């Protein structure tokens, strides 16, 4: 939860995406504005009656005109509704980016925790084997241990160190991804805590598939697909209103150029929609509605398929985990000490010794993989549903 809060506050991609909502709100504000009036002024350059240039007196000719466009058929309100729909899409897009980043954060979190534990297994084996090697070198110098046996142990130790190095390189990459998500400086490691006891409480039967299918409606991408249809319908209404005639009123003053001096008049102008009735844009808007409708249907079907696969994946991961025995992890140190003691006493051969080391290591790593798979399956299901179904 702390990591998710840092993601909300610090992630640069999320902050950048949030600006799209502000931009969409600005477009709503813009759509509410009325058209500006147009003012025209005209002054005669040369008065032939008195020979004056730019005569601004009573005998000089000057005109002034003001014109205001008035939108008909509710064009302004329809444009506002369209921009509100676009803002809603921007909000859902932000939620979708957040859903994706949160999933990436949680999966990286789980990967780091289990990668760290895997390195701990290598550390224990390397530490134990290093102590054994020190004792063997002393015996080798006394001639009690053959060079072949010592070489086999050195080879095993080198192999473990190489595998550990690969795990550490992977951990560095995962830490880098986590720091990028949380906008932390490179190399800054934060402590991560993951409670395994939660795995014993996971019960898929408590949340039936049908219930989760009903939860899909809150998914941001599905809400965005629906908002696209709504915005397309709003656009069709706007385009139809744009087919209405353009109407404007104007007032005019003419000082000395009309049939009387100081002439005042008002007028109107109306476009005649004979040729252009916005047919092309109306048809395009209708097609856009059908297109977005099909895309919404596809998004819903895709979400249901993803949910079905994720639900089954979690069930299988939980079933496989519960069929395993995690006691080996807790008894790991005691088991290794027992193997070392038996090997020193020659109760087991070199091949058996190496096999025990490899088997214990592989079993512990596989157990971590089983646990990790359950956590990742829970996170995948949470992401697909669009809300937290399983807490951890």
Give the residues covered by each predicted segment.
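Short flexible linkers and secondary-structure junctions
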Residues: 1-111, 147
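Acidic, low-complexity, intrinsically disordered peripheral segments
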Residues: 1-4, 186, 366-392
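Bacterial Sec-pathway N-terminal export signals of envelope proteins
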Residues: 1-38, 43, 69-70, 144-146, ...
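Amphipathic alpha-helical coiled-coil segments
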Residues: 16-31, 97, 101-122, 131-133, ...
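Short, charged, amphipathic alpha-helical segments
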Residues: 80-84, 147-156, 350-358
């Amino acid at each position: 939860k702390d990591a998710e809060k840092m993601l909300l506050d610090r992630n640069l991609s999320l902050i950048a995406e949030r600006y799209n909502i502000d931009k969409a709100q600005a477009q709503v504000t813009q759509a509410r504005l009325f058209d500006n009036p147009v003012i025209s002024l005209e002054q005669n350059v040369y008065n032939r009656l008195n020979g004056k240039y730019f005569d601004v007196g009573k005998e000089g000719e000057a005109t002034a005109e003001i014109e205001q466009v008035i939108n008909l058929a509710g064009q302004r309100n329809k444009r506002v509704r369209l921009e509100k729909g676009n803002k809603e899409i921007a909000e859902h897009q932000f939620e979708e980016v957040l859903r994706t980043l949160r999933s990436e954060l949680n999966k990286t979190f789980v990967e780091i925790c289990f990668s760290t534990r895997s390195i701990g297994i290598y550390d224990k084996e390397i530490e134990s084997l290093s102590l054994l090697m020190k004792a063997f070198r002393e015996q080798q110098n006394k001639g009690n241990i053959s060079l072949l046996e010592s070489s086999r142990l050195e080879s095993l130790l080198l192999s473990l160190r190489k595998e550990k190095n690969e795990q550490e390189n992977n951990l560095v990459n995962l830490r880098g991804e986590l720091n990028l998500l949380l906008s932390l400086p490179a190399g800054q490691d934060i402590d991560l805590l993951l409670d395994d006891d939660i795995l014993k409480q996971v019960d898929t039967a408590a949340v039936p598939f049908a219930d989760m299918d009903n939860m899909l409606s809150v998914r941001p991408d599905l809400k965005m697909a629906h908002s696209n249809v709504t915005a397309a319908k709003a656009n069709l209404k706007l385009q139809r209103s744009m087919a209405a005639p353009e109407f404007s009123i104007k007032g005019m003053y003419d000082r000395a150029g009309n049939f009387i001096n100081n002439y005042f008049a008002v007028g109107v102008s109306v476009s005649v929609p004979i040729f252009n009735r916005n047919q092309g844009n109306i048809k395009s808007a209708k097609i856009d509605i059908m297109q977005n409708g099909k895309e919404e249907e596809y998004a819903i079907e895709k979400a249901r398929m993803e949910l079905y696969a994720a639900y089954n994946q979690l069930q299988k991961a939980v079933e496989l985990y519960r069929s395993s025995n995690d006691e080996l992890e807790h008894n790991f140190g005691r088991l290794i000490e027992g193997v070392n003691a038996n090997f020193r006493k020659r109760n087991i051969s070199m091949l058996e010794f190496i096999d025990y080391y490899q088997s214990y290591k592989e079993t512990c790593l596989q157990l971590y993989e089983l646990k990790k798979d359950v956590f990742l399956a829970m996170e995948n299901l949470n992401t697909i549903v669009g809300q937290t179904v399983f807490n951890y």
